Amino acid sequence: MSLITAGIDIGSTTSKAALWVDDRLGPCSIGPSTTNPRATARECYEKVLQEAGIKTEDVACVFGTGYGRAKVSFADDNISELSAHGKGAKILLPSARTIIDIGGQDTKVIIMDALGEVLDFGMNDKCAAGTGRFLDFIARTLGVSVKELAKLHASASYQPASLSSMCSVFIESEVINLVNEEVPLAFIVQGMHQSVAIRVAALAKRMGLVEDVVITGGVAKNAGVVDELERKLGIKVKTFPDGVDPQMVGAIGAAVIARQKHLKRSGKQA
């Protein structure tokens, strides 16, 4: 009989659930976070159970993580986002030593040792610039969807518009001015991605970047931001195996840690 564990990651903008079945990744679920994190966690969990065709009693252990981890009322325990992302990234990409997690409302840089233990971390949670919310905000200003940003970035020659401000409020004014000056949308998007990369790269360099580097969070799906980060860091960012959603890394890590804790408590080896 398979040993199934679950990880629930309640983030600021999205909530995720992942199942770990024996030594492999099982079904995953993702949806928007709401003002009722308890209900959101339950809904996300039930969705992934339904996809797997199992019941709650079939899951040996559940761990919560993310901003809303304390609201995962059915969890056996919870862990920090740092530990969850560290474990998730390491199990998916064993060579990973630095994680750049660009979330909805903050950016984290996590440095790990060869075993995946967190050595150091840094966070930018004081300003929206350099986060997923910033990209959402500017995309709305431009009248496009977030999913269109990467395509726009690659749709023209590389001529990023200059955005002098590092504040999201002032950048909005700059973007509006650029639109009024009829600067091509692709160049504005390139400039916006460059602005995000400058802020994130500055944090990463302060931390003392160690390769291999991997990006997690929803912004990791934006090839334009990844391209700009590689330019600013001067390295090639690694990617997870095909089919693995970079937004799921925290939930996956929580599920793996849940398995390890369950085996330890039951006197078995992980």
Predicted features, each with a name:
Residues 1-24, 97-116, 158-161:
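Gly/Thr-rich phosphate-binding beta-strand-loop-beta motif of the actin/hexokinase/Hsp70
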Residues 67, 209-232, 244-247:
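Glycine-rich phosphate-binding loops at beta-strand->alpha-helix junctions
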Residues 171-204, 247:
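Adenine-nucleotide phosphate-binding core of ATP-dependent small-molecule kinases
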Residues 114-155, 256, 260:
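Glycine-rich phosphate-binding loop plus the immediately following alpha-helix
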Residues 4-39, 43, 47, 118-126:
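Short glycine-rich, Thr/Ser-proximal phosphate-binding strand/loop in the N-terminal lobe
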Residues 21, 27-33, 52-83, 110, ...:
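Short beta-strand-loop/turn "lid" adjacent to the catalytic site in phosphate-handling enzymes
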Residues 81-82, 230-252:
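Conserved phosphate-binding/catalytic loops in two-lobed NTP-binding clefts
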Residues 132-136, 242-270:
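Glycine-rich phosphate-binding/hydrolytic loop that grips phosphoryl groups
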